[in-house]
């Protein structure tokens, strides 16, 4: 009888162990077989590289693209550059080529090489790509043209980009297109020319041209905009209308019919008030478009108490007030006419600026403010390249106000300290000038040295050299003395500072002393030629001084602003050419006047 074969235990376990080992190997982590390269990277560069090393062909290219995107995301530009160059040597599908171009463009943007983006980011029109890639394509081109300061080209890309974004982003794109167009000047925007096929872009451009070129005539602008929107109901601007345009469309242009002019026609300020009144009525009589039903009630504020004024305004059905002139009367009358919210019942243009302004009251403010004039001087000096100004002002309250206004405005543009000096009466002018230019200190130092050395020194006092401009707030009689004192105080071998002055120096009287070379500011009516206006005023008011003419000009501008203020409140930066300057308003409805400049002795 044969014994049955005995199975060897080691031989039995060997195949079992092998099977277990193979099973263990097959259950380890696997490299993914696909990846969406249009998504943002979620893994590290190292992880993407591991996947790329364990893949080949098209899948390997996908992993390398994601690795390059991850490197850019982490700010590792050197690694991103290596991967971009490696991908350039590989065969890529259309989608891969697109994503590689996008990654390369993003890399150049991070290096501030926007011109390279425009050159290298160039999808083919026949490529069949997902919308996400086209969206990224136009987004990057927008960023590149914006960096190159080419807003019109950026708008071209934005218009096309709008085809690939959802509705929630359409309003943002429309806002960006409009913002780009508003950055152009009136001249620049008329030089832009879309292609014939760019109807959407052309529509945006046309609206921008209307807003830039017709802003001086808001009623005409409103009518033009209404016609455009009626004919272009499907344009993005009709769906996402810019707030600036909407404010014009919503504007109800109502001109005052019954106006009250409130002035202190008796008492201390009677002469000033009468000149303002004359200018106001002069402008009204020259207004060919004036409503034949319009009325004007001139009221002497010194003859009535505030509550009486209020009653008279009500009885006369006044719908617009010009004045008062005095600050205290403005404040009291504002209280009489205000409701619980502080809003006045009758819109007004006050002819002075109270010390404390309240916003949203319905009152605007126009005045010939010396502070406004001197603040513009600070801006003018800085704009013309002067860095170290000296302001020379009279002692007293006016001088302090002028200096404070100049310093406050100068600080907006420069950290350089303004040199300040106050002058007293005419007998002390030379001493004041020598003091501010450092001659007295220089003389004292020379005297000290001579005392120490017991010998006379062959030298002369030296003036300070850190002043490149002098703004002088002075009357013409004072300026004729100050100018030669400054010329003498400056050393012959030093470059003399440029001299500027305010409107007080332009009295209109014949100058017997030489003021040649001093640049001064004043209202346009006194510096710009207007034969028709000059002839009219000379016939009505012969031998008027410049001081009187400025007050008459204030009255003229007050009349003009009655019609312009509604537009100025809704049209950003809307400017009006007035007799006292180019007029604009700020958030508190204070009228600012851009004055003119001229040089004494200039032809």
Swiss-Prot record:
A lipid is attached at residue 25 (S-diacylglycerol cysteine). Gene3D superfamilies: 1.25.40.650, 3.40.50.2300, Tetratricopeptide repeat domain. Pfam families: LppC (PF04348). InterPro entries: LpoA, Peripla_BP_I, TPR-like_helical_dom_sf. A lipid is attached at residue 25 (N-palmitoyl cysteine). GO terms for molecular function: enzyme regulator activity. Its main location: membrane. It comes from the Bacteria. Keywords: Cell outer membrane, Cell shape, Lipoprotein, Membrane, Palmitate, Peptidoglycan synthesis, Signal. SUPFAM superfamilies: Periplasmic binding protein-like I. The keyword Membrane applies. It is found in: Cell outer membrane. Residues 1-24 form the signal peptide. GO terms for cellular component: periplasmic side of cell outer membrane. GO terms for biological process: peptidoglycan biosynthetic process; regulation of cell shape. It is a lipid-anchor. Regulator of peptidoglycan synthesis that is essential for the function of penicillin-binding protein 1A (PBP1a). Interacts with PBP1a. Belongs to the LpoA family. This is Penicillin-binding protein activator LpoA. It comes from Vibrio vulnificus (strain YJ016). The gene is lpoA.
């Amino acid at each position: 009888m044969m014994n049955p074969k005995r199975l060897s235990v080691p031989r039995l376990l060997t195949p079992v162990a092998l099977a277990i080992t193979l099973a263990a190997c097959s259950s380890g982590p696997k490299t993914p077989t696909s990846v969406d390269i249009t998504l943002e990277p979620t893994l590290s560069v190292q992880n993407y590289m591991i996947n790329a090393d364990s893949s080949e062909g098209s899948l390997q290219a996908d992993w390398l693209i994601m690795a390059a995107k991850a490197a850019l995301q982490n700010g590792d530009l050197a690694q991103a550059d290596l991967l971009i160059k490696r991908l350039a040597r590989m065969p890529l599908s259309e989608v891969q080529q697109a994503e590689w171009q996008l990654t390369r463009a993003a890399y150049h943007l991070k290096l501030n090489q926007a011109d390279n983006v425009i050159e290298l980011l160039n999808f083919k029109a026949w490529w069949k790509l997902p919308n996400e890639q086209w969206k990224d394509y136009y987004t990057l081109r927008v960023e590149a043209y914006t960096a190159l300061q080419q807003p019109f080209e950026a708008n071209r890309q934005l218009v096309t980009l709008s085809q690939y974004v959802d509705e929630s982003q359409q309003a943002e794109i429309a806002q960006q297109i409009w913002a780009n167009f508003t950055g152009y000047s009136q001249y620049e925007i008329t030089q832009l020319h879309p292609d014939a096929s760019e109807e959407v872009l052309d529509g945006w451009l046309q609206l921008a041209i209307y807003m830039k070129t017709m802003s001086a005539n808001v009623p005409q602008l409103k009518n033009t905009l209404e016609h455009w929107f009626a004919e272009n109901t499907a344009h993005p601007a009709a769906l996402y209308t810019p707030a600036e345009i909407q404010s014009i469309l919503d504007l109800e242009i109502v001109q005052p019919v019954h106006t009250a002019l409130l002035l202190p026609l008796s008492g201390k300020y009677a002469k000033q008030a009468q000149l303002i009144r004359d200018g106001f009525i002069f402008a009204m009589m020259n207004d060919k478009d004036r409503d034949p039903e319009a009325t004007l009630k001139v009221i002497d504020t010194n003859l009535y108490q505030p509550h009486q004024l209020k009653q008279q305004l009500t009885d006369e059905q006044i719908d617009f007030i010009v004045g008062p002139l005095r600050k205290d009367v403005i404040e009291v009358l504002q209280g009489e006419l205000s409701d619980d919210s502080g809003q006045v019942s009758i819109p007004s243009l006050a002819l002075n600026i109270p010390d404390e302004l309240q916003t949203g009251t319905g009152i605007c403010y126009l005045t010939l403010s010396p502070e406004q004039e001197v603040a513009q001087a600070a801006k003018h000096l800085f704009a013309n390249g002067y860095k170290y100004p000296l302001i020379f002002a009279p002692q007293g309250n006016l001088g302090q106000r002028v200096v404070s206004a100049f310093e406050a405005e100068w600080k907006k543009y420069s950290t350089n300290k303004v040199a300040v000096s106050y002058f007293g009466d005419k007998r002390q002018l030379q001493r004041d000038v020598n003091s501010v230019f450092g001659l007295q200190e220089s003389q004292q130092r020379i005297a000290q040295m001579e005392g120490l050395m017991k010998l006379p020194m062959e030298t002369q006092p030296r003036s300070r050299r850190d002043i490149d401009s002098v703004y002088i707030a002075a009357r013409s009689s004072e300026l004729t003395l100050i100018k030669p004192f400054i010329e003498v105080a400056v050393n012959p071998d030093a470059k003399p500072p440029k001299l500027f002055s305010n409107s007080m120096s332009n009295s209109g009287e014949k100058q017997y002393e030489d003021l040649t070379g001093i640049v001064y500011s004043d209202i346009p009516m006194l510096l710009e030629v207007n034969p028709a206006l000059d002839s009219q005023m000379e016939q009505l008011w012969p031998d008027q001084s410049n001081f009187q003419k400025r007050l008459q000009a204030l009255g003229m501008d007050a009349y003009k602003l009655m019609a312009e203020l509604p537009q100025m409140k809704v049209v950003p930066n809307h400017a009006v050419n007035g007799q006292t300057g180019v007029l604009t308003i700020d958030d508190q409805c204070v009228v600012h006047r851009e004055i003119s400049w001229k040089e004494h002795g200039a032809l």
